[in-house]
Amino acid sequence: MSAIKLDGNLYRDEIFEDLKGRVNSLREKGIVPGLATVLVGDDPASHAYVRMKHKDCEIVGVKSIRKDLPADVTQEELLAVIDDLNADPECTGYIVQLPLPKHLDENAVLERIDPAKDADGLHPVNLGKLVLNEPAPLPCTPNGAIHLLRRFGVELDGKKVVVIGRGVTVGRPIGLMLTRRSENSTVTLCHTGTRDLAAETREADVIVAAAGKAHMLTADMVKQGAAILDVGVSRVDGKLLGDVHPDVWDVAGAVSPNPGGVGPLTRAFLIRNVVERAERA
């Protein structure tokens, strides 16, 4: 195992120290930032993610509000909870934990969120602002991934980046963010319709694996010294696995572990979105 470990936990702790000071300053002014989560159903992974988010709130000093709903909640009942959070002055920002059960209209739920309270940065208005390069809450996982690369000195300017996966939470927005002038990367977005994935990845300086297919990126698909971000998650035989095969560590120059790589920064930038909105209020 020769690759540098892109340890998200180390960087998360640095971000949390900064946020603690900012939250204390807000509290001195009588402002208490509040993060709410909306969780539908009993998926163990989703419950684990939400627990970690609320633990992070406790560490930083942000008020946490939790809305847990049964798996058979109706669309109308879920939208009513969204409306309540939109109107709640104690809720600075919130997220709806995805994915939702299949009987619920995910897009309609996301559209119902007040864009100003969209802590995940996934509301259509905020994604549109990302396209236009206007200020808005940024999607947390792509933002965390890019900051992780920066923190460890991985060069992006002019580099070829291959993104595997075209989902709305990672693949599509990270492609937009990497082509901003601040990153200035050349991005190839690969997906199930890509004819020769390995031919694309072998040319990449940086690979973002966000397909949700366990161990699909193998060493023979990676050029020597490339930086690899493992963002995808799959459940196999009761275990959570990333998209990157362990043999990639012997070829790559830097790899984010999964868990412990991008995930901690996803949560850190979620809280930062909430704190920044409180600072603007």
Curated annotation (Swiss-Prot):
The keyword Cell membrane does not apply. GO terms for cellular component: cytosol. Its EC number is 1.5.1.5, 3.5.4.9. GO terms for molecular function: methenyltetrahydrofolate cyclohydrolase activity; methylenetetrahydrofolate dehydrogenase (NADP+) activity. Pathway: One-carbon metabolism; tetrahydrofolate interconversion. Keywords: Amino-acid biosynthesis, Histidine biosynthesis, Hydrolase, Methionine biosynthesis, Multifunctional enzyme, NADP, One-carbon metabolism, Oxidoreductase, Purine biosynthesis. It catalyses: (6R)-5,10-methylene-5,6,7,8-tetrahydrofolate + NADP(+) = (6R)-5,10-methenyltetrahydrofolate + NADPH; (6R)-5,10-methenyltetrahydrofolate + H2O = (6R)-10-formyltetrahydrofolate + H(+). One of its GO terms (biological process) is tetrahydrofolate interconversion. InterPro entries: Aminoacid_DH-like_N_sf, NAD(P)-bd_dom_sf, THF_DH/CycHdrlase, THF_DH/CycHdrlase_cat_dom, THF_DH/CycHdrlase_NAD-bd_dom. It comes from the Bacteria. NADP(+) binds at G165, R166, G167, T192, V233. Homodimer. HAMAP family: THF_DHG_CYH (MF_01576). Catalyzes the oxidation of 5,10-methylenetetrahydrofolate to 5,10-methenyltetrahydrofolate and then the hydrolysis of 5,10-methenyltetrahydrofolate to 10-formyltetrahydrofolate. Belongs to the tetrahydrofolate dehydrogenase/cyclohydrolase family. This is Bifunctional protein FolD.
